[in-house]
Amino acid sequence: MASTSNVFASVQKMGKALMLPVAVLPVAGLLLGIGAANFSWLPESVSLLMRQSGDVIFGNMALLFAIAVALGFTNNDGVSAVAATVSYVVLLGTMGVMAKVFGVVPVTVMGIPSMQTGVFGGILAGGVAAVMFNRFYKITLPTWLGFFAGKRFVPIITALAAIALGLVLSVIWPPVQGAINSFSHWAAVSDPRLAATLYGFVERLLVPFGLHHIWNAPFFYEVGTFTDATGKVV
């Protein structure tokens, strides 16, 4: 029972952590929508500024999720946010190299050729950063390495862990992405009514436990594509 309670508490904590980047979306949506509307009373430069500001938030949601997950599991310690950023960019770089090895066409994410893992990659990178922080933030090293002891060691070990994660994801992710694409096609084209019913039923079941944010994440940020206000397919 204790292990079940721990798992339940961890999943709840994950759900709460995901709400931090989600809270930014309304502002990002307003900026993007108003900027793309090209109102006659709004100078073109201001519209462009608002549109780009909103678009850059949506374009970097995975990084925001990585930071939020790391903070959520480390009592909001800022070092974990740095570690999460390191974890995510190293993950992208590793998967970019492996994409060439496996013959996968890379996409550019934050200027880095990589595989497109979306917010899942960010969540995993943040989770790795949180685990490394909680494991090593009190580590002691020999005197001549004392500068790197304690919390300063966390981003270093996180980078190494992110390389390992990237190697594993490079093998696992392509078939997973294929399954997600197949599911999104089924949900949007083959039987959207059944898909909506299934989603709503499970989501309502999880609300009393505070776990619905976990269920929502793949539907909100991974499944399917859409065209935003600027005409960009996401």
Where are each of the predicted segments found?
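Residue-level signature of transmembrane alpha-helical entry/exit and packing/kink sites
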Residues: 59, 118, 122, 154-155, ...
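Small-residue-rich segments of transmembrane alpha-helices in multi-pass membrane proteins
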Residues: 151-161
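Aromatic-rich transmembrane-lumenal/periplasmic boundary elements in polytopic membrane proteins
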Residues: 173-233
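Transmembrane alpha-helical segments of polytopic membrane transport and secretion proteins
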Residues: 1-5
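Hydrophobic alpha-helical segments and their helix-loop junctions in multi-pass secondary transporters
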Residues: 91-99, 161-174
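Early transmembrane hairpin of solute transport permeases
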Residues: 7-149
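Juxtamembrane interface elements at the cytosolic ends of transmembrane helices
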Residues: 128-144, 160, 168-181, 213-217
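Juxtamembrane membrane-interface segments at transmembrane alpha-helix termini
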Residues: 92-102, 156-157, 190-198
